[in-house]
Every structure is written in C-alpha cells, then in structure tokens.
Amino acid sequence: MSLSNNISKAARNLSSACNSMDFAKPVTHVYNPLDYAWPAHKQYIERAAITKKKVVFLGMNPGPFGMAQTGVPFGEISAVRDWIGIDAPITKPENEHPKRPIEGLNCQRSEVSGRRLWGLFSKRFESAENFFTNHYVVNHCPLVFMEETGKNRTPDKLSSSEAETLMKVCDEHLYKVVETLEPNWVIAVGTFAEKRAMIALDNLDINIGK
C-alpha cells in the first residue's frame, strides 16, 4: 500500500471514531471536515503524502475559516486553492451552526494562522510540490467544536471524560502518520500540539519541537 493510501486509511479510521462520539453542553455543534470535506482532504493527502518526510508540522484542530472550510490543515482559502491546487467539492455538515456556515472555497473569511503558516511556506518554497517533498502538515484533532452562540471551543476545554476518549484516537492517528512518513522532526504549532506529540510519540525515536 502506498504512503498516501496509508495516510488516507488512517484519516478515515480517525473520522469514523470521532463520528461515534457525543459531546455535552456547552458544545452544541461539532464539525468533522474529514467527513463533509473528505474529497478535498483526500486530494490534499494525494498531493502531500507521497514521500517520506523530514518534518511534520502539527496543529491542534481545525479553525472555523481554515480546515473547517477547506478540509486542509491550516487551510487558508487562497493557499489551498491557488498554491496547493485543491479543487474538490466540499459539502456541508449535517448540523450546521447558522453563525458558522460552511462555504468551502467560496468562504470570504481568512484563517489568520493559516495565512501566516502557508504564507511562510510559499515564500520559502517555489511550489507546493517542492514543499511537500520533505514536509507535511496535519492536525492532532480533526473536529471543530462550537457553543450555542457560535463561539469556538478548543479541545483543551472539553471535559476530562470527553477529552480522554477523543485524545486516545487522535494520538493513535498521529502515531500512524508519523510511523508512515518517518520524519526526523515533528514541529508543533502551539503548546497543546507539543504536549500531545510528546505523549503520542513517546516510544518513537523522533525530535519534537515547537
């Protein structure tokens, strides 16, 4: 099985595991872009995960105007569409929050962290293909959590019982990604991602930075 097929299979398994979970209030809406934006995420994997890597960049979870819209980690619209070249169809989640509509590549809002990250990569590398030769970007958790008001709720704010179940499957997915791509480094974007990488990859011989 090819590297990209292994990564796709791991993502599908993670998506299925997450879809079986329930989350209590104040969480009222949960988006899983590995579900409704799967064609775009699969296209991303097929372009980005075809070689072993030197570095894997790890984020916490999708932002409302990034991966939630595009299916690509830190997926700022213009970077996903114009630099990476993603053009797959993106549908809507079943329980869409009226204040957080999914507009896909037509979304007019910009993910600030994604604009910075992919902007940095596009300045350093002449093409996305060149970047993906040795680098990959993935989120630890694929889910977006919202409260009744539409406020974003990050995974570190979940109850301990909810977090324990979710973190287990997310850690297992991260382990599979790193085991498959064999990077020298995992670079965490933020303290939460760094903590999860240290836990999930504890028995692998790998460098973890932030």
Model region roles, listed by residue range:
Residues 200-204:
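Glycosyltransferases and closely related glycan-assembly transferases
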Residues 191:
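Flexible loop residues that form catalytic
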